[in-house]
Amino acid sequence: AGLEHLTPLLAEGGVVAKGKVVIGTVSGDLHDIGKNLVAIMLKGAGFEVVDLGKDISPQAFVDAAVKEKAGFIGMSALLTTTMPVMKDVVALARKNELLRKVKIVIGGAPVSEEYAREIGADLYAFDAASAVDRVRAAADR
């Protein structure tokens, strides 16, 4: 309920789109406050954001990234029990020729940079600000 009040404060208006990010909370995880903050801040930083919501299956992430021609897939998990879904998304995305150049960014309380490397994600973000910084840096390359 409070996020709609934060949106205008966190978004920098009038920015040309720098890329497209498909974002969501993985299957089995209904916690989306962090994901929502990342989405708002990415929009404010000039990215087009396709927010899939929460409890999103690996196939839904991949299908959306293909449909939207996204440059990034962003995933969030708050529960350790849902972290393996991130690995499933990475594996499925890597098998899709259309997603060869897509960068995958993960974050959430139990997630670490080590886990990101272990599952083959391209980027790890420890909070919303670092998510924006890392996506922005990757988009500029």
Q: Which residues are covered by each model-predicted region?
A:
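Domain-level signal for soluble alpha/beta catalytic cores
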Residues: 1-72, 77-106, 110-118, 122-141
